[in-house]
């Protein structure tokens, strides 16, 4: 499907944003782009993308504004900076296509900001990492006004292989949180399985052979598990972002009164791993399960009676509090500024 509308992408220099922007341009769309570190987006000019110096310049004349940034603070900050260049008096009004993974509360805030400025809002996070993004094979979790879909379809066609309609704005983010809980759980379980195999002197390849062809043989686990065994952590999706996403899952569970003790532990592991390996692929969570074997030599023989593990119920409050602090500490100031700005514009 063709469109004459200009597309502006805020966050065009990241692993995902760069690939998505390039695919839009290669699909024949008129694309303008901005990235906080301009150098990371400059190569897009080779595909005809206008790389702007500011968000306001990037959105000038655009009918659709895409945000693909690391967290809620970056999203709200970029969109606030873009507002002076956005003309909401046009018919039809501009649409803010928010594709970052930012959580429930931040998504509601973004919708409020858009509504206060006469801008349409569609919440459409994506499933997929760098490689599917480069191939234009992302899965898009669309939510928002259905009448916006025809205008957005050319963008979806350029970057994705499938669009799932989730419902009203915000439902896409909720679905993404649910999917992330599964993906992060699978990778963390795989990391501990590979670490256990190696610790017991078992070749991880034997594990994969044991489950090969069965319902336990998950292609994604095989991909990430092979990377762990090979110590290949070239980032497709950074561990720091996986930890951020884990805090969003923990936050939603807490808000909705759910008891997820297993995921609380997974979130802790990802947060711990991100402290040292945040810029590596999130399969590097495996490294948190591989202590110095020399230091542990003979430990089994000299260890005393095993202490009982604290119950999940006992661990839950502390784990969730830490996860939530991590989730909101950085973007909090930006969210407050955005909320104040939205209130004064009504």
Task: Give each language-model segment a name.
Residues 31, 51, 120-122, 163, ...:
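Hydrophobic beta-strand scaffold residues
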Residues 275-346:
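NAD(P)-dependent dehydrogenase/reductase Rossmann-like domain
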Residues 78, 101-181, 311, 329:
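Rossmann-fold dinucleotide-binding core
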Residues 171-285, 289-292:
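Helical "substrate-binding/catalytic lid" subdomain
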Residues 55-119:
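Rossmann-fold NAD(P) dinucleotide-binding segment
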Residues 1-67, 94-95, 130:
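NAD(P)+-binding Rossmann beta1-loop-alpha1 motif at the extreme N-terminus of oxidoreductases
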